[in-house]
Regions:
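Boundary/entry segment of secreted carbohydrate-active catalytic domains
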Residues: 18-44, 241-245, 304
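Aromatic- and acidic-residue-enriched segments that line the glycan-binding/catalytic groove
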Residues: 87-115, 155-202
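Aromatic-lined carbohydrate-recognition surfaces of secreted/lumenal glycan-active proteins
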Residues: 151-158, 183-252, 296-306
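Short, acidic/polar
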Residues: 33-49, 130-141, 247-261, 281-285, ...
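Catalytic domains of carbohydrate-active enzymes, especially glycoside hydrolases
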Residues: 34, 38-64, 144-149, 260-266, ...
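The substrate-binding groove and active-site-proximal loops of carbohydrate-active enzymes
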Residues: 30-34, 53-59, 116-132, 209-220, ...
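Active-site-adjacent "subsite" loops/lids of carbohydrate-active enzymes
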Residues: 80-144
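Substrate-binding cleft of secreted/luminal carbohydrate-active enzymes
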Residues: 263, 267-281, 285, 295-352
Length: 352
């Protein structure tokens, strides 16, 4: 009889685990701002809960996150700490160290020459002090009790190629890798590369053809991420990341090889309109990402490009059909009434 009880208990645990694994997660990115207001966040949490959202990726200081977590816990909503990793606009510590910043092929520093937009102020993953600063930022989030994960964003180089729909907005035609947008040429990087290959990448006529030079830059991002993950895991904290659509695409566009990272979960941003693609592309990118990694994938969706509720519904369903374990919307705060209805209906339907 005792053995039967043990077996029965085991089956219950397994059944619960399988149910949890089968759950299709609805989540959202949200900025917390610089000040915490309990009433505002209570309303936000209730709103997210009404939509079936069970996880929120919050951009805010550790102190603010500590105040949001207890409110979210009341609704069984998990809170992730959304961290801008290498792009550090307004970072007062980094600003005092111009040599920490990424350098493009023209020799321009990212603090002084800000590609595309003013908030593009990128640190170089090759500079040891910049790396230490980034890791220290992650450690502050790792220490937050009850935080579901450290959620890394902007963990890459600046876009060497923008999405097709974004280029006209900046009056740019990027039919090749232009030197002012091609980053990774920090003096430390060039010196280390030359030690190995006896070549300075700044002298390459066609640097985009050097697989060694691309891989060299990919590796420095990957080692940074995996170091953060190692520290987090040793403190029983998960690490997730918002990334470009699928590994091959992200390698080319932003020097980001996220299939080489030891993540607990990944959130590729499948914003199809940026690339002038259709809803089917979301399914393609999801399937490609799922096939490239052995950790869970959550499809990131862009609400302004899915204002038609039928498009939003199709984007969610095609993500699930192609192996995603959930979706994350940018952002739930911007959903119209019809989009909200889709969330409510599908969050119930897909998790019955």
């Amino acid at each position: 009889m005792k053995k039967l009880k043990i077996i029965f208990s085991f089956l219950i645990v397994v059944s619960c685990s399988e149910t949890n694994l089968d759950k299709f997660t609805f989540s959202t990115w949200v900025g917390a701002g610089s000040k915490f207001d309990k009433n505002t966040w209570t309303k936000k949490i209730n709103y997210y809960d009404s939509l079936g959202i069970s996880e929120i990726l919050v951009g805010g200081s550790p102190d603010i996150l500590k105040k949001i977590i207890p409110l979210a816990n009341k609704k069984n909503i998990k809170v992730h700490g959304w961290m801008w990793t290498l792009n550090r606009p307004g970072d007062t510590i980094a600003n005092k160290n111009p040599d920490w910043y990424a350098v493009n092929r023209k020799g321009q520093n990212s603090l002084e020459f800000r590609a595309y937009v003013d908030y593009y102020q990128w640190l170089s993953p090759f500079h040891p002090d910049a790396r230490e600063h980034i890791i220290n930022n992650a450690k502050k989030l790792i220490e937050v009790e009850g935080l579901e994960s450290v959620h890394l964003d902007y963990v890459r180089f600046p876009d060497v190629i923008l999405g097709a729909d974004l280029q006209p907005k900046y009056n740019i035609i990027q039919d090749r890798e232009l030197p002012e947008y091609d980053y990774g040429y920090h003096p430390i990087a060039r010196k280390e590369f030359k030690k190995i290959f006896d070549k300075d990448p700044i002298d390459f006529d066609y640097p985009e053809l050097s697989t060694e030079w691309r891989q060299f830059r990919l590796n420095t991002i990957s080692t940074l991420v995996n170091e953060i993950i190692s520290i987090a895991h040793s403190n029983n904290k998960k690490v997730t990341a918002a990334v470009f659509p699928f590994p091959e695409m992200s390698r080319q566009m932003v020097r980001q090889a996220w299939n080489d990272w030891n993540l607990d979960k990944v959130y590729p941003m499948l914003y199809q309109n940026f690339y002038r693609e259709n809803i089917n592309w979301i399914g393609f990118a999801t399937k490609q990402g799922v096939s490239d990694v052995d950790f869970p994938l959550i499809s990131g969706l862009y609400s302004p490009a899915l204002k038609n509720p039928k498009d939003l519904e199709r984007a969610i369903l095609i993500s699930k059909e192609n192996g995603a374990q959930g979706i994350s919307i940018f952002t739930a705060d911007g959903l119209n009434k019809e989009q909200q209805k889709v969330f409510i209906e599908l969050s119930n339907k897909l998790n019955q």
